[in-house]
Structures are given as C-alpha cells and as structure tokens.
C-alpha cells in the first residue's frame, strides 16, 4: 500500500480530513487515467503563512497553513469554494505532471505541468464535489483569467506561452481543458492524456513538448471537432454564441432536461 501522511501543527486540524480525502481520491482517480502513483508514500508538510502556496516535489508537498490547514471552509455548503481539497488535488496532479512527464525548456512547457495538473484537479472536483462546487470553481478560474489578462499587453496562444503567464497556464487551462473534455467526451479526452503520458513517461534527450501533446490529443478527437483543438491551443478565439430558444422538460425525479438552440 501507499503510506499517506500529513505533518501539521497540533491545533491546525480543521481541514485534515478533506486534505487526506483529496490525497486518496487523487491517487485512485489519476492512477486510473495516467497510470499508477509511483512512490511508497506521499507526505504533506505544513509551513507558516509567511507565504501562501503549496509546491509538489516527488512524494512530498510543502503546504502553507494559509491555504489549507486554517482555512474556514464549510464542507456542507456547495457555494463555499473547497480550497483545501482543490489545492491538494492540484498538487497531487504534479506527481504525474511534471514528475513523470516533464516538458523541455521551450514555449508551452509550463502548460504541460500546471495546465494538466489544473485540469486534473477540476475533473476530480467535478467528480467528488458535484455541479454546484464545480460551477463555483469554474467561475473562480474565469475571474482569475480575466483579471490576469487585463494586465497583459497581448495574450499569447497556449502553444506560445513563455511560462510566466499564470492566468493562462493555470486559470485558462483549467477552464478550457475541462470544457474540451465535455465536448470531445471525458473518456476520449482522458484516453488521450493516458496515451500521452504512456508515450513520454520519464523521456528525455529530447524532452517532450506541447506540440506532441496536441498531436496525441488530435488522435482521439473526431474530425468534426478538430477545430476545437486549433482554436484552444493555437489561436485566441472568441465565440459569438447566443441562445435562440429554450425548452425544459421536467423529469419524474424533479430534475429537468433543458434543450437550447
């Protein structure tokens, strides 16, 4: 088995169960898509709130008390963003991206680390916390993206990111990759990620790059949806969508099927 450990201040027990739950479920879910977690243990280590971040090293994650251990989170409130769960899930994603697949020092490399870890966290959040928590988190991602974009003179496409555009490689990536998985199909999208990590796990000389990731994704994407990959990674695309009509049908369980044109 895998030993899961959290080292914490004795009085900072508020979110330990949530963080441990995220560790367990990340290992199970990511392992089913990307391949097994490769270590005998995983440790989270609390540090004081002089800084507010977490950073994932192989099997060890230093984690600020400010964004996990002492946050006031109501797990029963679907409108309360479950930051300890999400941050843990994101950092656990790094155990695969980039600790198993690490991009070369070229444009787009940071997306392969941060963007794919962010997608992993969003998809796990959707799976474990439901639609209301997912929608709140996606709104958070969108707001952070728009705030970051406002301070950039010219937004580059994902494929051309240099590494310091956090609003793209974190927030835009999490939002757009989750949307892409919904449109292409979660099984197809995750199969592409599994295929990519299977091909390039621990590869170096040369290291893989974002172009190879995009090519692998195209292999699993239907022909009529190939444009979505081009629009997402290679261009800055603004869609002019609008609803012409809407029809709702109530189901026997009180839910609704909504059809939009």
Outline where the language-model segments fall.
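Hydrophobic alpha-helical and helix-loop surface patches within well-folded domains
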Residues: 6-255, 259-260
